[in-house]
Amino acid sequence: MLKSLSKLTPSIRGVVSINRSFCTKKFLPTNRSVSESDPEIYDLMMKEKQRQFTGLELIASENFTSRAVMESIGSCFTNKYAEGLPGARYYGGNEVVDQLENLCIKRALETFNLNPEEWGVNVQPYSGSTANFAAFTGLLKPHDRIMGLDLPSGGHLTHGYQTDKKKISATSIFFESMPYQVNETGYVDYNKMEANAALFRPKLLIAGASAYPREWDYERMRKIADKHGAYLLCDMAHISGMVAGKQAISPFLFCDVVTTTTHKTLRGPRAGLIFFRKTKRRDAKGNIIDDDLENRINFAVFPSCQGGPHENTIAGIAVALKEASSPDFQEYTKQVRRNSQTMGEELKKRGYSLVTEGTDNHLVLWDLRPQGITGSKIEKACDEAHITVNKNAVYGDTNAIAPGGVRLGAPALTSRGLKEQDFVKVVDFLDRVVKISLDIQSKVGKKMPDFQRAIADNQDLKQIRQEVKEFSTKFGMPGEL
């Protein structure tokens, strides 16, 4: 901070100096660090940093962002209200914010090689979930019909998830939802999707998932959507970084709208983006339709679903997008894919089963049902070893609390510099955790409370924890402040 102040003009330095003195009054915000002003929160920050540094982060939706992104999130942009769009705000004083948001829009389109005459983007959504609901709000009327991948098949809650007894997602509450599913191979069943769409006649067909390790057939989904005059939306939250790095098929070739988070494989802050096609489309009879998606999506974000955008987060998004446009980022996504495939192959070598028998992207879905243990138990046992994973449903599961699978992702550890040979070691740790867990289960039975009590004092898991710490701390922690 002091170094940056030295570069300011004399007049600005004087203002800053005055403000520093001014803020010594007790009722005003201070310039003290969090370690001085709130030791309790600072202590938690240090504990979390230690947890991330000494452990192995394998959750597919997590990543390490850069220091530049973190600095942007903590910048003075957090002070500014900016309801509306650039050039059309409901508050004054947004001349700099307008420049920021326009730059973020420009970078978002450039990162995904989009022509600004054909595509636009709203950079204001607070998260991926709000981006999705705003997109649905802009595209649909209440109780219109949607089809998305079922949650137990690897879909996301926001794609219309509901159970036999209850509508879970707001999407399923305000719209009529009929999911499509994977088949017994773990691949999306496009034939059944097409047959069900002919009966259900959706207004919106959604591609995208939170736990699907394979590429999407956007072209076929486009044809299915066109048969029923439906929009095709891709939620590329998990793979947006892979798309930017040219390691996944681009959904922009076939979709009307594309949503994403910015913090997963894209390595930005926690937020969302909505891309929309500006060009006109044709219906099944060849008639030109002007959907005006730009105004519909923008109005859905504000004022329909949100108030003022978080401009400090938008600054972080802009920084992350610049990073994602670099050759280094393309190399990163290539390494993510190699590491993910290595992880899958090493698990198979040790006799484990994978959904679809492999992966095309950043994650693998590990099926532990042949071993006779649940993903929820392995998640808890991994926690004891300081390996962070998440339980996940696999095809045929009926219990979301105790599913048969575990989702593993390579993005975070790849950001720390791990390569293929390092992921062989990671799989060794995972294999040992499973074997220890099976031994514990054989002794205490299958009830989760008994299992959790047994792993809490297990010396073998404590030994792995120490080895994990020694291994993990050999690698840096990006974004350290």
UniProtKB/Swiss-Prot annotation:
Residues with PTM N6-(pyridoxal phosphate)lysine: 264
- Molecular function GO labels: glycine hydroxymethyltransferase activity; pyridoxal phosphate binding
Name this polypeptide is given? Serine hydroxymethyltransferase 2
Q: GO CC terms on record?
A: cytoplasm; mitochondrial matrix; mitochondrion
Write down the chemical reaction(s) this protein catalyses. (6R)-5,10-methylene-5,6,7,8-tetrahydrofolate + glycine + H2O = (6S)-5,6,7,8-tetrahydrofolate + L-serine
In its keyword annotation, does this UniProt entry include Lipid biosynthesis?
no
List UniProt keywords, sorted A-Z: One-carbon metabolism, Pyridoxal phosphate, Transferase
Q: How does it assemble?
A: Homotetramer.
Its required cofactor(s), as named, are: pyridoxal 5'-phosphate
Q: In which pathway does it act?
A: One-carbon metabolism; tetrahydrofolate interconversion
- What is this enzyme's EC? 2.1.2.1
Superkingdom as given in the UniProt entry: Eukaryota
